[in-house]
Structures are given as structure tokens and as C-alpha cells.
């Protein structure tokens, strides 16, 4: 079998399909890229056990063509590094258990892995299918995944994103208990499903290049996705997700309206004197009894020092005293899903903050208060 390929197009295809491969995977075969070469296309499959990808590279019979058909499994990291060194035109030639690569005055030879030991992954969509705009879905994932506890390998639900479809609304949720991020997408689909996927898988989904639309196809033990020639299969977490809708309060006694850029600037300035060990803690204060009514953010760390910043570029709906300790990183990540003016709602007992904005009415963020100094 001999393949003739355009480097730039093939490299884009290879990198997009194999970016999920883990070079240190304990299953050695999963370090490989599995090629199935046919007369009109190349089928490429990759997997890291949690997520698997199948993609097709169409052969035009001119600059991209094959002489013969074959299946082979090649160490992905080695193949990719070689392709990057090649010039514009590449020839891949399989002979028995080796793959030879030629490009102008360069030549390489790689020993192949045993493709028969590569897992038999069943792609193809399930009966349940939901069509979405790809960018809308990926943005929704971005708007919630940061709230998951990526370092928590013990409590799977806190290191995951939940997707549920009910009453024509697809709801995406992530939480680490100290905060919740929720995004909703309106659909025209009346079916129902509820599934949870690991946050690492979510980040891998976001990174993939896809066509303009995609199909979500939930199953009992997996979520399948199809976008153009790209097919994805991911594992789901088989533990019921907690209901977080009722955690969001609906009664508040303090509301701040402030521009996102203004608040981000304040957080960046005050966080210079801060530390991860201190929980990146800052204090938000408002005192209506003072002559000059300003919003104050301050940070104190015994071994580092003290900082405070003020703003008069804001509005409040309640002339009451406010003191609210919060994780600065959580606040920054939450407001970054919005643009322009944001609204911050604080409960009467000052234990929770809810953030929303007219710029993204389908998203809301909740952050629990930290204890004071």
C-alpha cells in the first residue's frame, strides 16, 4: 500500500483526530493512530478510553491518492513529529510491519504496532438525536466547565459537566460545591435525557475542529457526537447528578450593577497581594453611611501585605452595608462568560452571590461566600 498526500491538509487532519491520544497511556496500543486506508478515503481512529474519535480524510485521486488498501497502527507521537519535518508532498508506504515515509530528500521507517490489538470501538449514532449549532454548544461547555473541580478524582460528579434535556431546554451544569455554573440552550426537541461527562472529556470536545452543526446522540452508557465526517464516542458517569436548580436563591437584599471590564480591573489590581493558600480571598464592601459612596475591594495576606481599590463607576439597588468575602479567581471566571454590564445579587444572610447579565440571559453563576479573616 502506498499513500500520496498533501502535508498541510493531512497534518491538520492528523492533529485534530489524534489530539486525545495520551503518549503515556498504559495500554500501549492506545498510543497509536489506527489507519484504515480505502480507495476513496482514509479512516483514522484514536482513543484514550474515555473518549474515542473516528474521522475521514477523503482522497481526491490527484494530490491525495492511494495505491492499494491496508489497515495499520502507528505510534502517533512519532508519526506526527516526522510529518511536521516533511515538505509539501508526502508518501506513506506500508511494507509488512513497517511504515516508510518519503518526502523530497528525506526518508523514515517506523515499526508498526499490532492493529489487531486495537479495541473494537462501535461508532454510529443512537436512536436519540439532537441537532445543535457547533459553536453554540462548544461555547455553552466553555461557560460551565471551569466550575468543575478538575483536581477531584474521588468525587466524579464534582469533576464533570451534566447535560439534561427537558421541556425543549438543554441545560449544562458544573459545580465544585463552592460554585455553580449553569447555561441553557433552547431547542425544538421534545425528547428528554440526562447524562454526565468528565470535565477532561469536555475540554477535549471543546478543542476539536468540527463542522458548523453537530448531532448529540445520548445512550445509556455513552454520548455519541457526529459533526461532518467526525464521529465521537465518550463514556458517561453512571451516577445520578444532583439537582442544583433549587440551590439558586430567588430572594436578595443587595444588588450591584457594574461593567465587566471595570470589575475585572478592580479584581486584578487588588489580587496583587493575594495567595492560593489564602483561597485567593478578597473582600467586597459597600458602606452607604460614608459621604463618598464607593465600592471597595480589598485583600489581606499576613506574610505579603494589604491592598485596596475603589470604584464609583457602579450602581446599587439597596442602601445597606455590605461585606462579602469571595474567591477572586472564582469571581473572575464567572464574570468572563458575560460582556458589558453585569448584575450581582447577594442574599440577605450574605452567604451566596448570583451573577447574571442581559448579554447572556441563558447563563447564571452562583458563588458561595468565604469566611472572613
From Swiss-Prot:
Family affiliation: Belongs to the beta sliding clamp family.
Lineage: Bacteria, Bacillati, Mycoplasmatota, Mycoplasmoidales, Metamycoplasmataceae
Subunit structure: Forms a ring-shaped head-to-tail homodimer around DNA which binds and tethers DNA polymerases and other proteins to the DNA. The DNA replisome complex has a single clamp-loading complex (3 tau and 1 each of delta, delta', psi and chi subunits) which binds 3 Pol III cores (1 core on the leading strand and 2 on the lagging strand) each with a beta sliding clamp dimer. Additional proteins in the replisome are other copies of gamma, psi and chi, Ssb, DNA helicase and RNA primase.
Name of this chain's protein: Beta sliding clamp
Subcellular localization, as worded in the UniProt entry: Cytoplasm
Name of the gene: dnaN
Keywords associated with the record: Cytoplasm, DNA replication, DNA-binding, DNA-directed DNA polymerase, Nucleotidyltransferase, Transferase
Signal peptide: none
GO molecular function: 3'-5' exonuclease activity; DNA binding; DNA-directed DNA polymerase activity
Amino acid at each position: 500500500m502506498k499513500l500520496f498526500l498533501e502535508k498541510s491538509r493531512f497534518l491538520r487532519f492528523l492533529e485534530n483526530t489524534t489530539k486525545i491520544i495520551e503518549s503515556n497511556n498504559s495500554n500501549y496500543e492506545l498510543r497509536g493512530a489506527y489507519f484504515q486506508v480505502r480507495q476513496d478515503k482514509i479512516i483514522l481512529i484514536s482513543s484514550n478510553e474515555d473518549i474515542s474519535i473516528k474521522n475521514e480524510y477523503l482522497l481526491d485521486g490527484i494530490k491525495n491518492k492511494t495505491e492499494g488498501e491496508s489497515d495499520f497502527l502507528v505510534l502517533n507521537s512519532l508519526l506526527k513529529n516526522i510529518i511536521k519535518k516533511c515538505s509539501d508532498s508526502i508518501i506513506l508506504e506500508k511494507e509488512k510491519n513497517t511504515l516508510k515515509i518519503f518526502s523530497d530528500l528525506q526518508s523514515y521507517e517506523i515499526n508498526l504496532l499490532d492493529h489487531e490489538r486495537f479495541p473494537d470501538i462501535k461508532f454510529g449514532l443512537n436512536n436519540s438525536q439532537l441537532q445543535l449549532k457547533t459553536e453554540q454548544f462548544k461555547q455553552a461547555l466553555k461557560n460551565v466547565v471551569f466550575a468543575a473541580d478538575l483536581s477531584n478524582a474521588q468525587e466524579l460528579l464534582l469533576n464533570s459537566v451534566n447535560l439534561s434535556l427537558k421541556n425543549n431546554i438543554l441545560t449544562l451544569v458544573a459545580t465544585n460545591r463552592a460554585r455553580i455554573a449553569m447555561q441553557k440552550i433552547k431547542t425544538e426537541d421534545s425528547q428528554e435525557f440526562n447524562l454526565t461527562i468528565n470535565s477532561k472529556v469536555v475540554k477535549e470536545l471543546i478543542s476539536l475542529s468540527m463542522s458548523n452543526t453537530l448531532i448529540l446522540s445520548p445512550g445509556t452508557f455513552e454520548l455519541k457526537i457526529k459533526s461532518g465526517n467526525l464521529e465521537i464516542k465518550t463514556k458517561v458517569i453512571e451516577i445520578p447528578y444532583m439537582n442544583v436548580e433549587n440551590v439558586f436563591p430567588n430572594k436578595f437584599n443587595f444588588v450591584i450593577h457594574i461593567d465587566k471590564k471595570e470589575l475585572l480591573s478592580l479584581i486584578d489590581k487588588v489580587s496583587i497581594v493575594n495567595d492560593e493558600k489564602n483561597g485567593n480571598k478578597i473582600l467586597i464592601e459597600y458602606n452607604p453611611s460614608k459621604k463618598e459612596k464607593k465600592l471597595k475591594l480589598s485583600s489581606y495576606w499576613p506574610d505579603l501585605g494589604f491592598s485596596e481599590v475603589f470604584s464609583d463607576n457602579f450602581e446599587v439597588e439597596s442602601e445597606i452595608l455590605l461585606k462579602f468575602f469571595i474567591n477572586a479567581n472564582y469571581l473572575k471566571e464567572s464574570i468572563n462568560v458575560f460582556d458589558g454590564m453585569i448584575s450581582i445579587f447577594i442574599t440577605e444572610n450574605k452567604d451566596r452571590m448570583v451573577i447574571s447579565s442581559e448579554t447572556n440571559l441563558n447563563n447564571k453563576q452562583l458563588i458561595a461566600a468565604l469566611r472572613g479573616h
